[in-house]
Amino acid sequence: MDITVSELMSNFMDSPLVVWVKTFGPLGFSSEDKLSMFMDLVDGVFLHKIMTHIDPSPMNQRVNKQVNNDVNLRIQNLNTVIRHIKNYYQEHLQQLIVMNLPNVLAIAKDPLSGKSMEEMKRMLLLILGCAVQCDRKEEIIEKIKLLDIETQAAIVTHIQEVTHNQENVLDLQWMEVAEIPAEQLDPLSRTMAFHLRKLIDERDESAELVIELTQERDYLQSQQPSGLLGFPSPERTSLSPITLLSKEDRQHLAVELADTKAKLRRSRQELEEKTEQLIDAKNEIERLDSDIQKLKQENTQLLAEARSVRAYRDEVDSLRERAGKVDRLETELSRFKEKLNDVHFYKTRIEELREDNLTLLETKSMLEEQLTGARGRCDKLHELEKENLQLRSKLHDIEIDRDSDKKRLEELLEENMLLEISQKQSMNESAHLGWELEQLAKNNEVNEARKSFVFELNESASSRLLKLEKENQCLQSTIQELREASINMEEGQLHSLELEKENQSLSKKLERLQSQLDQEKQTTQDMENLGEELIKEKQRMEKTLETIQAEKDRQISELEQEKEHLTQAVSSLRKRAQANSEARVREVETENRILHQTISETGGKLARLEAEKRQVTKELESLRERGERCEELEREVPRLERVREQLQREAAALKIGSERAEALERENATLEQDNRRLKKLADTAQNATLRLAVLEKDHQQLEEENLEQRRALETLRPAAARLAQLQQEHAELEREHEEMCRTMEELRSQAKRSERLEKSCGSLSLENQRLQQTLENSSTKMQGLESELRQNEAEMKDLQRELEGLRQKVTWAETLEKENRGMEQELSQLEKEKKQLEKEARRFRQQLEVKEAALEENCLRLASMEKEGTALSKELGRVKEAAGRLKELERENKDLQKQATMDKKTLATLREELVNEKLRVQQQCNELEKLSHELEKIGLNREKLLQEEHSCEDNKYKILETKIESALKKTLELREEKIQSLESRLEESSSLNQQLRTELTTVKKNLEALKQRHEEEAAHSEISQQTLGQTRSLPDKEKWEMEQREATAELLKLKDRLIDVEKNVRQRHVSIDIHRVIFSIVICFCDSLQNAALQTEKYLLKDQLKQIDSQNAQLNAQTLALQKQAASLQEHNTSLHKETAKLQVENSTLSSQSSSLMAQYGALQAQLQTLESEAESLQKQREEASAARDRVTQDHERLLGVHERQASEYEQLIAQHAALKASQRALEQENRTLENKYMVLLKQKDAMEALEESLQRDRESLGEEIRKNTLILGENRSLREEVDRVSHMHTQLRQEYDSLQLQTKELKTSLNESQLELNRWQARYDQLKEQHQGLDISMTKLDNHCELLTRLKGNLEEENHHLLSQIQMLSQQNQTLLERTMESKELYHEEQKQYIDKLNSLRRQKEKLEEKIMDQYKFYDPTPKKSRQWVGAKAIAKFIKPKKESSRERPDAPRERIRSAPDIPLPEIPTCIDCPESAPPPPPPPLPPRQSRPSLDSMNSQSVEENHVQSPTLSSPALNGRVLNESGGSRSRDGYRSIGGGSESMNGYEELLRWRSREPGGATCSTPLSRNSHNAPGFTSSSSLRPGRRPKGLVSEEDLRHHSPDAGFGSGVHGNTGHRPSSAEFSRNTSSSNSPVSSKGSLDCLQGRSASLSSDDVVGLAHEGSRLSQSSLLPRSSTLPCDSPSASRPSQRPASRRPSSPGSEMVTLEEFLQESNALSPPTVQTGSREDLMTDYFTRSTRPVPLRDGAKTPTNYVTPTVKTTPPELDARTPKPGHSVKPSVRLTDTSTPPSHSQTLPNRGAGLRPSALQQSSPRGSVGGSASLSRTFSLASADLLRSNGPDSYRTEAASPNQNDVVMRRPGAVARERPMSARVTGSSPLPGDPGHISVDPRRLSLAQPRDEFSLVSPPPLHSSSMSLQAEREYVGSGSSRAGAARSGSAQPRGAPHRGEVAMVTPVRAVPALRLNDLEEEPQEQREAESPLLKKADTTNLSYASKEQPTSKPASPDPNNDPQTVWYEYGCV
């Protein structure tokens, strides 16, 4: 019970509520004594103290402080506390306690119960609720916060229970509220209903309880009288004094009543006095309140006055300050003006920075390009690393092979040596045998038998010799092999040495690389740091810019506000002037103040602006510095790039590092293997150690195994040492490996870092751009601010002027007024302040007195408190000491209790042990007795048996027995003594007992071991005796004596042992076990004696056996009976002993109990005696008290009478006092009212006086104000005039400023534009510089060419004479043909006229061209001043005569076809050049079936049948110009004439036609159809064949299509997109980029030109082709075998027709040769009419796929040409050889002539298409010469610089557009006749990529392939007859005749037929040809669409001033040049 109470108390005292209560003060006497603390709480005094602290109101009742465990007082205290709590909740907190109040009875009666503690918790909870909601709650909460977190949390939950839980405490504040919202009403009503239900339940329960209590009372009352009667006498006697005492009580109660009445009176009197005091105090308070209100009013008035005075003062001061500030502001303004100039400077600086930024951006783009290159190199590095790894692996394999070879070599050397030795031996043997043979030959005289023997020997020797010879041969071969192997080995060793050297060098390089890497690391780190700094600076700049912007915005807004204020002020001034004078003056004053404020604000703002300007300047400086830093960084960037490039160059060195790394990896692998091996060894060692441990355990049993283990250990030790070493080595190697890995990772990280740096550079550049943008924005804002500043300055000036005027007036007006007012106010204020100060002084004195009195009281209290504190501290000390003692006593008590329980337990155990001990002792005694009996028996038997012999031994035995008995007795005595001592010292030896027990167990074990030994020894002795007895005979007495002696010795030993054991047992107090041991030993001894006796008896008495047997049997029977009896007696004895032991223990316990009871009895008797004495003394005291009581009752009665009298007197006095008090109060009230009235009157009087004074002052002031107002009005007018003038000035200035700003902006824009142009021109200048350098190089080459050209001239002139004669013949033939054709139809009359017009125009063109040629030939002469006339041109001109005859008859249908050809309309330049995909125009009229053409966009896919069908649709976007030009044909014609007309007569044309009509067979073209080259990017070619004429060998038109390259590769808009790499490649360089049409001015003339190609350019091909096919007798073939696509097919093309053009009306050199071939069979027709001079221009750009290395013939025009046999088709004679032309057979394929167009060239721009061959002079392709050879060569000079050979080699697929008729698929017209303006279709793959930098058409370099066959090209441009359109009808008719749907283009003007040198090129394989179209399609760019259209007009303008150029003579110096003038 005690424990539970203490636990409850400790739990309660540790609860959070009690911990909180302790914060109010100390509980109990000591903080450690929980009981006293708890009792303090229960008594209620401390709780009351807490409640008074919470609610210090005087209504609270007092509490009994000294409770002294009195229940009633405790109940009273607790009730007062609860009442106080309830009142506080209801009155102060407006809350109702709903929870059950604490049960005071339970707490008071049984405070230490759990229930009372729960009730106390409830009370503390209510107090906590009061404390948290009281006025001092902050202080209490602060105290709570100082507690632990857990207690705080618990207290918070408790607070929530009280405050928030409506079930515990109900809030009544809602009753005061008028209307409760519906949201609060619902929960409130619910809680109210719950509480109501609870109250009703409690009411019902209490009603039931009352009923039960009344029933019990009634029952007890009914039972009481009967109980009293039946009570025994002593109870009655005890009840009688109660009835007697009731009278005395009544008297006592009466006295108390009187006393209480007196007290009541006193209290009433006090109450009345207090009420009176209260009323007085209330009156005093009311009076004081009224005084305070008055004082407050006065105070407010005074404050208002003081404020006004201060305001005036402040105004005066501010005005003075402002007047002083004006000068300062003016100076500041001047300063600002100066700074404006700086702002302009900064503007310029910003612009400069922008420019710098642009340059930085350009550098950034350059750097990015370099970066891309560097990245590419990095990618290559990875590939190189892979290769490096592969090479390493190969090297490793080689090394392995080398090692194996070395081993093999060594073995072979050994074998070689052995073989040499054996060979020497065999040689010696053979020599010896030879010698023997010689000897035998000499000794022929020996007998036959001997001869036969020698013969046999010779035979055997010869056979052996043969064998040896064979072996020798084998050995020699092996020796030879070994020698070779040794040589190989030596080479391998040398190679390995070289590799080692390389490795060393690589390692050095690696080291160098690493050092460089470290350097670059540092540089990269520096760069990163710089980058980070730049980023930080950028961020700072951004922040500063943002702040500047914000500040500027703020300033702008402030300035605007100021401006508004100023404008408002001006307007208010105007309004004020019109108002009354008084109002005006006040307004002026206020406005002045405002103006002064604004001026001060503007001054502050100006200062701020200055500061900001400084900041801006600083920022600009910092920006400059950053810009400089950026420039430095940009300078560093290229350096870093260089470093990076060096590193990339030295990437090879990294390979070495990787090789080393691999070697290390291999070593690492080997080391890992070693490591594994070592690990295995370590595992084995560990296993060995485990085994060792096992062996060490076994070592105790097996010493031999231990030795072996030691040996094994010794063997393992060195291995362990070796293991440690190996581990260290392995660790070192691992470290090295890790270091290598780190280095590799560092290298990688550096690579990544460099990439990151590059990215960061990019990001920095972007950030720079952004910063520059922000700078620009800031500069614009600055400009805006400057403008606003200027405006503000102007406004400021105006305002200052106004202010100056106003100041003078205001100062004059205000000074007087303010001084007067100020003086008056100061006076009144001083008076009021004086009064106030007097009152304050009085108040302070009173307060001082009160505080002094309070101080004295406090001092007294302090002293008393200190005394109490000292006393309390002493008491506390005492209480603490007492508590400490108490705790110590409690601890001792607990310890004693524990000891007592332990002692009880030990006693019980000891009792049990005693009983057991006694039993054992009795048993041992019994055993001893038995032993003694047995010993006696044994002794007797022995005496009987051995009386004579063993007398001495008997004595010894007896002595032994006596000794044993004595020892036993002694031990028994000792044991008894010890038992007694143990019983006496039970308590002391409890601890020793346990120790002894543990020791006993060990001793027992030892004894048991001893017993076993003794038994074994005894058994051993018995066995030994028995064996001895069997073996020995009876008479052997000596032996028996010896045995006896041994037995006695053993006994003696046993005795000694027993003595030792006894001693040990004595020492350990274990006598019982010793007895047992002794007993067992004795038994053993007896047994041994018996055995000995029996043996002796056996030996001695064998004779008496029979007698003794009978006796023995009887004795045995007796002994058995006796043994049974002894066993039964023993059992009985043991049971008796047990009983006796139990009885003894019981006896001892009873005796101890009786002794304790006796002691208790004695103590009780002593207590009884003391109680009796106390009872007697109490009886005496009782008697004395009864006597005193009687006396007191008498005194009390007397006092009652006195009290009654005094009460009546007192009541009378009180009534009188009340009346006097009432009269006094009435008088005081009257007095107060009178005083108030008097005060009011005084105030009224003062007010009247003040009013009079103020009125007088107002009159005076009004007069003054009227005067002032008049002055102010005049000033105001003047100010207005000034304002108007200033505003006018301001507007003018503003306008000027705006105009200036506009001008500056325009200037800036123009400056920027000019700078941009400058940059562009600079770039252009750089490009031109590069071109110039290239041209210089080419010039040197071309100078050499010029020399060669001069040599060629003579030859050419001779040739021209020869050709002119042929031309005459041809012209005659042509004339005859024309006559025939013109006779056939009347329609050709019109055509004849058109031809004449065309010829006239061509004549004009020719004349112009001749002039140009003459000009151009100046350049070919080394002395350019001398101009040579071209003799050939004049000679040719003589042959051409105009034929003006009318048309003649046409002999046959083919001529009709020829006649229809010229009517094909000419396509013109499209109107929209840049719109290639514009919609096609309406289709032309239907075409005749024989002349219908396929649609251009479907040329690739159309079948042969489609070729025969009319195709009216137009598919090329370039046809847009057709409709436009149909109406305006005449205009285009005039244009043609104006630009380049020719002077060709009709004669030549007709002769040509005649000659062609005489040609019997179809002529073949020697170049493949439409094998387009790069020289015609902007042109289209159109070839046409007649339906009736097909080439030989082709059955149908479909065959033509299939066999021609055109059909094979398809023709989009371009026709066949073939490649002519051999014959026209050089002409690409010349004519594509340098043609005379593409002059510098061509760009300007782009729009002004309508057409640049004659109308028959497109059509004339068909004419000429058809004529040629009719007239040619033999198939035209080249002397060279050109491997065309048809050549490789079974059906060869012997009669493929060449394309014709309008230019073919003039007889070209080719045609002349064809005619001569036709006339003279021995000669050969040239392969092309254009290919005479192409040989010179040919450049071999390929890696010679011509297997035989054939070289081309250079001269096809010389009369004597060496023929090439058919079998040597692939070979051609070397350049310079004179080759005779031979007639080729018809079956050999002759490639059709390849035509090409003249390319367009932009002014001053070099086409990139010409730059695709290497600059070493290997020119990538051939091109045709345009109009004149001289112009072409001049342009060649320009384009044939070092760059002109670059791109050409790689562009096989630049395309010409070929236009076809249905039946003429295998034909192609020349370049000159192709449609220049036609742009390709969108779908066409044959486009050329445009290089936008050079405005030319180029192809990628790497797309050049040796795919297309190298056909011979015609590079001469036929003169194009200009077609004149008579009208739209004639053009339409022509279109219908031609049936072509070809695109329109700008016609060429002034194109001239040229002859170029011809070079035959060896054929390529067919598969190359077949691969070509795919490559072409892939390579061609769609950009050609635009380029084609843009280049249309480029070809029209001529270039009269171009330098002469000639092809590079390096490749082909023996090429002969021929020139054929324009005819």
UniProtKB/Swiss-Prot annotation:
GO terms for molecular function: dynein light intermediate chain binding; G-protein alpha-subunit binding; guanyl-nucleotide exchange factor activity; microtubule binding. SUPFAM superfamilies: Hook domain. Pfam families: HOOK_N. GO terms for cellular component: anchoring junction; cell junction; centrosome; cytoplasm. Disruption phenotype: Impaired hinge point formation in the forebrain and midbrain cavities at 22 hours post-fertilization (hpf) in 95% of embryos. Moderate curvature of the dorsal axis in 35% of embryos at 28 hpf which disappears at later stages. Mild abnormalities in midbrain and forebrain ventricular cavities at 56 hpf. Residues 1442-1460, 1890-1904, 1974-1988 have a biased composition (Basic and acidic residues). A motif (GBA) lies at residues 1700-1728. One of its GO terms (biological process) is cytoskeleton-dependent intracellular transport. Residues 250-415, 458-1064, 1105-1419 form a coiled coil. Residues 1478-1491 have a biased composition (Pro residues). Residues 1623-1643, 1667-1704, 1927-1945 have a biased composition (Low complexity). InterPro entries: CH_dom, CH_dom_sf, HOOK_N. It is found in: Cytoplasm; Cell junction. Positive regulator of Wnt signaling, acting synergistically with dvl2. Functions upstream of ctnnb1/beta-catenin in the canonical Wnt pathway, and also activates jnk in the Wnt/planar cell polarity (PCP) pathway. Acts as a non-receptor guanine nucleotide exchange factor which binds to and activates guanine nucleotide-binding protein G(i) alpha (Gi-alpha) subunits. This promotes apical cell constriction and subsequent bending of the neural plate during neurulation via arhgef18. This is Protein Daple. The gene is ccdc88c.
